[in-house]
C-alpha cells in the first residue's frame, strides 16, 4: 500500500483507529502523527503483529475508508 495514501487518509482513519484497535490510546495516535512507518511499528508493539500483518491490517482499513468516502 502506498504510504502517501495512508498519510492522506490519516484524518479519516485516526477517528476510527481506536475502534479498530482498542489497545491504542490518543497519546499513541498523537505520537504516530499519521506517519505510516510509525503506525506499523505501533501495531507491532501493541499487538505483536509482524510487519507484513500490520501492513495488511492497515491496507484493509484504508480500503474501508476509501469505500466509505466514495459512498458518502
Named regions from a protein language model:
Residues 1-72:
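Intrinsically disordered, low-complexity, hydrophilic segments
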Amino acid at each position: 500500500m502506498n504510504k502517501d495514501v495512508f498519510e492522506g487518509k490519516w484524518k479519516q482513519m485516526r477517528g476510527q483507529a481506536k475502534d479498530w484497535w482498542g489497545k491504542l490510546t490518543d497519546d499513541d495516535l498523537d505520537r504516530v502523527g499519521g506517519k505510516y512507518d510509525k503506525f506499523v511499528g505501533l501495531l507491532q508493539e501493541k499487538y505483536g503483529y509482524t510487519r507484513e500483518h500490520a501492513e495488511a491490517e492497515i491496507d484493509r482499513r484504508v480500503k474501508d475508508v476509501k469505500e466509505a468516502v466514495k459512498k458518502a
